[in-house]
Amino acid sequence: MISSDVIRGYNDTMILFLLQHNDSYGYELSKQIKLLSEEKYVIKETTLYSAFTRLEKNGYISSYYGEETNGKRRTYYHLTPEGLNYYHDKCREWNITKEVIDKFITVSN
């Protein structure tokens, strides 16, 4: 399991990555993160919804209500063009970060 402290700065990146493909809602996005990380990272609900609020406030995503199911309407999130640009910036930042950290990480058998 990955510590949430280690990955905190990249929750937004993971969400934006997933929203490139389809609009989605919170529970589905959390399941996709768990699945793609091979269950090494499980995003907490509070972390996820804090990220949605931050991303929407910054214009990186927009939200809308979907059809009502079981008495409740889901909130769907959509990636904006600004969000796609931000995602690409974060990917470049990650590659630089990884390059630097790799210089300090050694793996011994």
Feature-to-residue mapping (PLM):
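Beta-hairpin "wing" of winged helix-turn-helix
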Residues: 56-73
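Basic amphipathic alpha-helical segments that dock to polyanions
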Residues: 48-49, 55
